[in-house]
Amino acid sequence: MKRRPRKWKKKGRMRWKWIKKRIRRLKRQRKKERGLI
């Protein structure tokens, strides 16, 4: 495991949160599509 500078940790957390939000949005869109069909 390579050691990362402390600055990277915060960026990684923000990215992870953003990814989770996107996944939630995609799931919501799929539910809406199923309801329309």
UniProtKB/Swiss-Prot annotation:
Disulfide bonds: none annotated. Keywords: Ribonucleoprotein, Ribosomal protein. The keyword Ribonucleoprotein applies. Signal peptide: none annotated. One of its GO terms (cellular component) is ribosome. Part of the small ribosomal subunit. Initially thought to be part of the large ribosomal subunit. Crystal structures show eS32/eL41 to be a small ribosomal subunit forming a bridge at the interface of the 2 subunits. Belongs to the eukaryotic ribosomal protein eS32 family. This is Small ribosomal subunit protein eS32.
